[in-house]
């Protein structure tokens, strides 16, 4: 039963509720529209690398021209979904003899989706972004198929009675709208008469996406094999999609050889705006400092100068930072493949399949590919490792790789839990022997493109429109059964840049070639672009806000707080701004403590920081405990229309905060937990309660 009041608002006040709701929806819709207007169309690959231009936006015609009977579309923000789409297409071709192609949803129109022959299959690999939103490149597709007056070319009844499709989603189970994009697309297509092959796959980023993918595709393939009368091949032989040839007429210093440049403009030294996800801006680092540092932990504050560019941001947006791989990992990758001596050899890549686009620039070098273009530090997949078994340096290694490929638990114990990437896995399983027989094209095809890392912007666009700041925890941790530490690629790259900026002691491990291709970066610029979000302060500055952000989860809230401080300085009235911040100890990792004092001096009692130190005192105290202590004040603020925000660890902290808020509502209102959960759900639906989400 739903309670007859929602936070002090009686059902009899429906007229007022309607007006308030209309205002809320209008405001949030305005932000959504603004974000969409500001947000450039996102391609998963930089424009320069699309060597095979499409003849048009008619994918059915393209399939017919190329003789394809299976197309795998992807909706991807960081390249992960694109990677799974490529793997799916590759397996369909090698294992079942399908004629496959991979396609970006943003590159085609879907008016003729009903023209796909019933003898074909369409597959979707779809990531969910934000609070159930489509990725940038899937927005138009979703908008079209979900339109009330959607009108396909042939006008069948049902509309898509000829369409056979399969769907795998990428999401995070800890979020409310888990895999909403994949579920929604499947629901819409099914409601229009399309036939879903198998179940909708749910990849969980909070669990093991790789194993979720493996579990989903086997029954899907089984059903598809039956429906399309496919024959599974007994022996899977690697069939290269890309040819790699040496080019002895050039060397790494040749002007037309890519040595890390992100597009042709940068290669020729004439890069210019507009800057966006396919043309990142080489932003100068305006300021950088370590907020704290210890033997095993660091935290960086870094500011990027975007003054004079077309890049605009709003408080609450994300900035994408394009990293490079560390020297040690580049060396290890080339060494285990026996390519150290050939690292600077110029090679050209070409596609054997007209539908497959070369994912990296060409011509280039082995060193460049490993350093700038591939995710060589990413966890190796069980499927990819198993594919390499025939190229093992000896029989015992082949047997071990085969076992790792077949035994999920064995793979988890010896590879996944040790956080091994492809080079360390190959070196471990072969006891240090080199794998010189693997075609290099296998790595280009199977390892994702090195993707930008997205960080919450921790500055205010009202206060600093020409500067974007980030607050980054540097990832460095010990791993069981592993001698060396595990290092985050991008965060340690930023740490190296910070040390260089301030003339500090260089980072011993990992080290980076921070000068960039042809010394273009000089250790002082970083490729970046802006991604807009709907994580916003309320448009009414008098509305209270409650923010929960332990650790670097405080990043977007620093932007919110600085925005409100600036509003006060401009003479605007502001509501109570309450921050719950948690860390280990006040002395060790209380970031921005002095800054909060400065804010307090300006905002007075309109600003308050409630701290939770987990390693001070006999008992551990976390932000959810402080929420319970402040239950009465939180209830009062919510009755005044406060917006509630959470950013940080989604798997643990955010879930605990959600439970605490639900309990506060239940106890203070005297309603059941089920009723309190319904109230919290409605708060989320109206964007009164927002969670800052990681981008998959």
Regions found by a protein language model. Give the residues of each.
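FNR-like FAD-binding dehydrogenase module
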Residues: 1-696
């Amino acid at each position: 039963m739903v309670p007859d009041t929602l936070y002090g608002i009686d059902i009899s006040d429906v007229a007022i509720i309607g007006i308030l709701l209309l205002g809320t929806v209008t405001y949030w819709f305005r932000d959504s529209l603004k974000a969409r207007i500001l947000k450039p169309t996102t391609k998963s690959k930089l424009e320069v690398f699309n060597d095979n231009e499409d003849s048009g936006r008619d994918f059915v015609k393209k399939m017919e021209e190329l003789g394809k009977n299976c197309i795998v579309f992807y909706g991807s923000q960081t390249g992960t979904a694109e990677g799974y789409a490529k793997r799916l297409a590759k397996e369909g071709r090698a294992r079942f003899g399908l004629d496959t192609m991979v396609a970006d949803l943003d590159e085609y129109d879907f008016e003729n989706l009903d023209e796909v022959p019933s003898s074909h299959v369409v597959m979707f690999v779809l990531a969910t972004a934000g609070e159930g939103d489509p990725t940038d490149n899937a927005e138009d597709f979703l908008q079209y198929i979900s339109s009330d007056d959607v009108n396909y070319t042939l006008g069948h009844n049902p509309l898509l009675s000829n369409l056979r499709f399969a769907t795998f989603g990428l999401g995070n189970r800890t979020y409310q709208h888990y895999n909403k994009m994949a579920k929604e697309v499947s629901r819409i297509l099914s409601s229009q008469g399309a036939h879903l092959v198998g179940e909708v796959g749910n990849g969980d980023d909070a669990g093991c996406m790789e194993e979720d993918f493996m579990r989903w595709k086997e029954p899907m393939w089984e059903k598809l094999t039956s429906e399309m009368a496919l024959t599974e091949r007994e022996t899977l032989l690697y069939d290269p999609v890309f040819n790699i040839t040496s080019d002895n007429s050039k060397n790494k210093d040749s002007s037309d050889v890519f040595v890390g440049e992100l597009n042709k403009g940068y290669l020729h030294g004439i890069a210019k705006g507009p800057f966006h996800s396919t043309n990142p801006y080489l932003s100068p680092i305006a300021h950088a400092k370590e907020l704290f540092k210890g033997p095993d932990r660091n935290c960086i504050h870094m500011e990027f100068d975007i003054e004079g560019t077309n890049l605009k941001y709003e408080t609450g947006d994300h900035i994408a930072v394009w990293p490079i791989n560390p020297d040690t990992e580049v060396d290890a990758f080339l060494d285990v493949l026996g390519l150290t001596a050939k690292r600077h050899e110029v090679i050209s890549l070409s596609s054997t399949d007209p539908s497959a686009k070369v994912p990296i620039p060409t011509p280039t070098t082995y060193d460049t590919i490993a350093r700038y273009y591939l995710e060589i530090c990413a966890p190796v997949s069980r499927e990819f490792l198993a594919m390499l078994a025939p190229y093992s340096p000896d029989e015992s290694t082949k047997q071990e790789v085969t076992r790792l490929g077949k035994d999920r638990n064995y793979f988890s114990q010896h590879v996944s839990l040790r956080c091994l990437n492809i080079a360390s896995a190959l070196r471990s399983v072969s006891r240090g022997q080199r794998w010189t027989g693997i075609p290099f094209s296998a790595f280009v095809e199977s390892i994702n493109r090195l993707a930008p890392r997205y960080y919450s912007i921790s500055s205010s666009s009202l206060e600093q429109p020409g500067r974007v700041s980030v607050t980054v925890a540097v990832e460095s941790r010990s791993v069981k059964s592993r001698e060396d530490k595990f290092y985050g690629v991008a965060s340690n790259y930023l740490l190296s840049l910070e040390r260089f900026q301030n003339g500090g002691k260089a980072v011993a491990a990992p080290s980076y070639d921070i000068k960039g291709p042809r010394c273009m970066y000089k250790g002082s610029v970083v490729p970046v672009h802006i991604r807009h979000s709907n994580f916003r302060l309320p448009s009414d500055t008098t509305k209270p806000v409650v923010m929960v952000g332990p650790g670097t989860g405080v990043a977007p809230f620093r932007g919110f707080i600085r925005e409100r401080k600036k509003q006060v300085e401009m003479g605007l009235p502001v509501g109570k701004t309450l921050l719950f911040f948690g860390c280990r100890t006040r002395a060790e990792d209380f970031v921005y403590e002095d800054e909060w004092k400065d804010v307090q001096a300006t905002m007075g009692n309109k600003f308050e920081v409630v701290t939770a130190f987990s390693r001070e005192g006999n008992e551990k105290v976390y932000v959810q405990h402080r929420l319970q202590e402040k239950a009465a004040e939180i209830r009062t603020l919510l009755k005044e229309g406060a917006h509630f925000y959470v950013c940080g660890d989604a798997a643990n902290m955010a879930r605990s905060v959600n439970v605490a808020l639900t309990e506060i509502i239940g106890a203070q209102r005297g309603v059941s937990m089920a009723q309190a959960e319904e109230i919290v759900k409605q708060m989320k639906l109206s964007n009164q309660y927002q969670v800052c989400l990681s981008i998959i």
